[in-house]
Amino acid sequence: MRILLTNDDGIHADGLAVLERIARTLSDDVWIVAPETDQSGLAHSLTLSEPLRLRQLGENRYALRGTPTDCVIMAIRKLLPGKPDLVLSGVNAGANLADDVTYSGTVAGAIEGTVHGVRSFALSQAYSYVAGHSIPWDVVETHAPALIAKLMRIDLPPGTFLNLNFPNCEPGEVAGVDVTSQGKLDFGLSVEERTDGRGLPYFWLRFGDRKGNFRPGTDIGTLRDNRISVTPLKLDLTDYAVQDIIAAALNSEVGS
């Protein structure tokens, strides 16, 4: 089985090293194509206004000056000797839950793999943002190999990929695995204005207190219960339930 690894935290990220160890428990044909620099929050973006610079760092290991989407495209269309059987994106430092998935470069790596018809999983490890708290990488490293092996035996529909989130706890405290839906999260974003040395303003986006929907069955609620969240997502964003409502309203307007 050929496995392609990518991420959005960059080629030297701890989470990518963890993901490589996970992948090598499943296969000896592992390829890594990851961004040269941190690409967090760039979602499913392409680099179209400047060239893509590629560096080989070792056997089947490459750093690309581009986004996670660029990395998957470069790997599948240029570098690999054949299409991979699995794309793993991550392991992200921090959970990708609820509305996070629309911003996440980690999730975008799985999206692009799915665009190319390859089974794809995004992996993220939750942790406490309180100063002094480390990221419990041993949780995902302990539990992901068996979980991925089980998920590989499932025949997913075309256009579907999986978003895996691992809880912030000790490996032995993980209470199980839930198949979840996306929750709802308010990031509490604000815009902070500062002044540079020339007296000109510049701005930072800042996260405040996050408020969300923690009900059972959602990705957020599941992680709070120290359970692994597996959320099936799909490329098709069409809201089929609303199609007929809109069509009926438009037809009514035309006839009036």
From Swiss-Prot:
Q: What is the lineage of its organism?
A: Bacteria, Pseudomonadati, Pseudomonadota, Alphaproteobacteria, Hyphomicrobiales
Cofactor list: a divalent metal cation
Keywords for the protein's UniProt record, in alphabetical order:
Cytoplasm, Hydrolase, Metal-binding, Nucleotide-binding
Q: What is this protein called?
A: 5'-nucleotidase SurE
> What InterPro entries is this protein classified in?
SurE, SurE-like_Pase/nucleotidase, SurE-like_sf
GO terms for MF:
3'-nucleotidase activity; 5'-nucleotidase activity; exopolyphosphatase activity; metal ion binding; nucleotide binding
Function, please? Nucleotidase that shows phosphatase activity on nucleoside 5'-monophosphates.
What is this enzyme's catalytic activity, as reactions? a ribonucleoside 5'-phosphate + H2O = a ribonucleoside + phosphate
> Can the keyword Metal-binding be found in this entry's annotation?
yes
| GO cellular component terms attached to this protein's record | cytoplasm
Enzyme Commission number: 3.1.3.5
Q: Where in the cell is it found?
A: Cytoplasm
User: Cofactor binding mode, per the note?
Assistant: Binds 1 divalent metal cation per subunit.
Instruction: Return the NCBIfam families for the record.
Output: PRK00346.1-4, surE
> Where along the chain is a divalent metal cation bound?
D8, D9, S40, N92
The UniProt family comment states: Belongs to the SurE nucleotidase family.
Spell out the HAMAP family in the cross-references: SurE
